[in-house]
From Swiss-Prot:
Entry-linked Gene3D superfamilies: 3.40.50.20, ATP-grasp fold, A domain, ATP-grasp fold, B domain
Any matching Pfam family: Dala_Dala_lig_C
Positions bound to Mg(2+) 1: 268, 282
PROSITE patterns the UniProt entry points to: ATP_GRASP, DALA_DALA_LIGASE_1, DALA_DALA_LIGASE_2
Cellular component, GO, one term: cytoplasm
Protein name: D-alanine--D-alanine ligase
Catalytic EC class: ligase
Species name: Herminiimonas arsenicoxydans
Encoding gene, per UniProt annotation: ddl
Enzyme Commission number(s) from the entry: 6.3.2.4
Disulfide links within the chain: none
Amino acid sequence: MTTTVQNLKAEFGKVGVLFGGRSAEREVSLMSGKGVLAALQSKGVDAHAFDPAERSLAELAAEKFDRVFIALHGSYGEDGTLQGALEQLGIPYTGPGVMASAISMDKVMTKRVCLSHGVPTPRFTVLDAETTSAAQLQSVAAEFGLPLMLKAPHEGSTIGIAKVETAEGMQAGFDLCAKYEAVVLVEQFVKGRELTVPVIGSGRNARALPIVEIRAPQGNYDYEHKYFSNDTEYLCPAPFDEAFTKRVQALAVSAFNAVGCTGWSRVDFMVRASDNEPFLLEINTSPGMTSHSLVPMSAKVAGTGYEDLCIEILRSAKTELKPSSHMQLQEQER
């Protein structure tokens, strides 16, 4: 056993890698979690798999993990609920805390918060999934112009998203998104280039990694192209001049800090073709860590390999609240 392995075991103790879960993004989470687990174990970390869809919070507490790496995506893992449970249990965890996770999981709230901090985002409105009429849909299409992006505000991995290019397609696109949630986000389509910017750290120490540009066939960066296809082209670092690169990276850090993110996240943008203006799309607080994922790709360009990236993220694990005296007493009684 090397000194490095010994040091990591002593530093991190028993580590749980949480992946799988109950959201629509379970399949992606399984891929992310298996990659993270293997990476940590290859570094000598005492890491163990834990699937919250198959095991209870009581079992999580019984494992007595010293910290956990959250590799869950979507509801029940990326939306603040799990983070709250881990706070109650006093287990340090990776990624943003309760509030930042909850805000970032909600595309509507993310847009509102970031707009208030000067980060531009496409024009939008929110429609009720049950009461919106066909006439209202047509009215929105006429007001905003086509094409439009319709989204389920709390889903990710391109799940619950429809691009509507004709007035006749509004109802089908709306129905696709409405089956996931109580409201549907309608967003003005931005024609241009799709970018993503990983951000690592916290507060003043938050730093943006190299920008990744995503070029999917016919611009169709859907679930299949995102995780399984080899047809999508990724350019990292994205081919922009230094001034524009720094501008987008600064916007990414501003958005990250605006919602209160810590540890790591990924900030997605569209750059409008007509005037090269960037627009925030969303913030992912538990980004994918699969073989096709963008954070590892960007980190590699910056000089950090997959295993070392996992270690850096794990090292940032924390709880936001200090354990109460009651929790400290319970710990002493164990």
